[in-house]
From Swiss-Prot:
PANTHER family: D-AMINOACYL-TRNA DEACYLASE 1 (PTHR10472:SF5), D-TYROSYL-TRNA TYR DEACYLASE (PTHR10472). Keywords: Cytoplasm, Hydrolase, RNA-binding, tRNA-binding. InterPro entries: Daa-tRNA_deacyls_DTD, DTD-like_sf. A Gly-cisPro motif from one monomer fits into the active site of the other monomer to allow specific chiral rejection of L-amino acids. An aminoacyl-tRNA editing enzyme that deacylates mischarged D-aminoacyl-tRNAs. Also deacylates mischarged glycyl-tRNA(Ala), protecting cells against glycine mischarging by AlaRS. Acts via tRNA-based rather than protein-based catalysis; rejects L-amino acids rather than detecting D-amino acids in the active site. By recycling D-aminoacyl-tRNA to D-amino acids and free tRNA molecules, this enzyme counteracts the toxicity associated with the formation of D-aminoacyl-tRNA entities in vivo and helps enforce protein L-homochirality. Belongs to the DTD family. This is D-aminoacyl-tRNA deacylase. A motif (Gly-cisPro motif, important for rejection of L-amino acids) lies at residues 133-134. Signal peptide: none annotated. It is found in: Cytoplasm. The gene is dtd. One of its GO terms (biological process) is D-amino acid catabolic process. The keyword tRNA-binding applies.
Amino acid sequence: MKAVLQRVKHSSVSVEGKLINEINEGLNVLIGFEKDDNDEKLKKMAKKIVSLRIFGERFEKSVADIKGEILLIPNFTIPAITKKGTRPNFQNSMQPSTAKEFYDKMVKELNNYIPTKAGVFGAEMQVEITNNGPVTIILEV
């Protein structure tokens, strides 16, 4: 499981020109699930996302500490293998039906900690962010 976290002042997701969700200060998280992911990894990733200290002048606060929000965007391209050639290889990406289940579980798990809004699994989305910093972190569990 891999995630790209971006510290944001604002983030929104739209589908076909229609606003689906938006947040103010918090994290925009692009998440990709891999074939070998399981519930244990999911819980570990959720805890790490919520607890990672990337806010404040000296990175002393987490998104939970600042009472921020999360916008969670599903993205099957995150686990792409890019070491060879010029075309990404998606053989490590989880099958869509299973990945949707994992995505729904992740939204629920994150909501146990802080307000989390979701993108639309399987849709062509337009994601807008106002990156704060910029601070962008890649997590892998």
